[in-house]
Amino acid sequence: MNRRAAARPGRAVIALDLGGTKLAAAYFTGDGRPRAKRVVALRERQGPAVGALMGLEIRRLRRAIAGSGLSVEAIGAAVPGIAHADSGHVWAPNIRGWDDYPLRRELETAAGGTAASLAIDSDRAACVLGEAWRGAARGCRNVVFLAVGTGIGAGILADGRVLRGAHDSAGAAGWLALSRPFQTEYSACGDFEYHASGEGLARAATRLLSQTAGYRGPLNRRRALSAKDVFAAYEAGDVLAARVMRDAIEYWGAACANLVSLLNPEKIVVGGGVFGPAARFLDAIAAEARRWGQPVAMGQVTFEASRLGGDAALYGAAVLARQAKRAVGGR
């Protein structure tokens, strides 16, 4: 990954990272640092209102770039769900009204003809690009970024290129089949995600609470549990939370073993909203993976927590922009 991938001197790229609840936006210059960064909550926005917000942020950053005496070279946007490269449309199940949203058209309008190129890709693809550029996978050409948050996804870099698949949906790691027998609940989000995402941890804790008579620990004090509650209870030495985390480590380890055996990466980078507090379990996850994975490949891979944290996709969006510029003849 070219460490000077963000922008040439005197020019800047605009980077957008859209999540299910917020939008982060910044511009990058040749030094690879985000400038004029802002994070805006989506609040009640849905459908075209979310696209309009992205357009507003592009216009804001265009003004900031011009005020710094620079010019806009390209725009990159990371989005949840599936970004269709051919049409520029996006399917994002966590944004209402984005079943087939024409995002490229919205962003081209906001660019006002100033950007020579525009790239839209999945947040999982952006995360692995960001980590390979400025994060935990610098210098690596074969990397898997496993994102564990509300859901689960994987960004895959194979021989220096993002693996997107025939129809742009590669990396839907939440659908890894790790359990038997099949349960109908898996149809909504996938087996792995059902059990080991942030929502999965909360679901597992709630189920154990209902099965544990006489429990008086910290998890009994809340009506609706979250992964944050589970981590806090684990830190307090709660036995029930320890059971939840033990099971989660088994799922995360088995999934990593499958990814390593199939793809033979140099590095597995684990990130996402859950993996702030869960980074402490990385050694246990790697040990579990080694029980299951192909032994030669497992001996060649290293495991590391994200170094960019919540900014991984934003950095990756800058890389996407620069790649798009090169694709249309830029240097």
Report residues per predicted region.
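Hydrophobic "anchor" residues
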Residues: 22, 33-34, 89-90, 162-163
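Glycine-rich phosphate-binding loop and adjoining helix at the ATP-binding site
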Residues: 47-48, 52-55, 59, 63, ...
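Conserved phosphate-binding loops in N-terminal lobes of ATP-dependent enzymes
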Residues: 2, 8-79, 104
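Proline-aspartate-enriched helix->loop->beta-strand connector
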Residues: 260-269
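Helical "lid/coupling" subdomains associated with nucleotide-phosphate turnover
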Residues: 249, 266-267, 279
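Glycine-rich beta-strand-to-loop/alpha-helix junction loops that act as flexible
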Residues: 75-81, 270-277, 306
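Glycine-rich phosphate-binding/hydrolytic loop that grips phosphoryl groups
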Residues: 28, 121-132, 276-331
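Glycine/GP-enriched mid-protein hinge/lid loop-to-helix segment characteristic of carbohydrate kinases
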Residues: 2-4, 8-12, 26-29, 36-39, ...
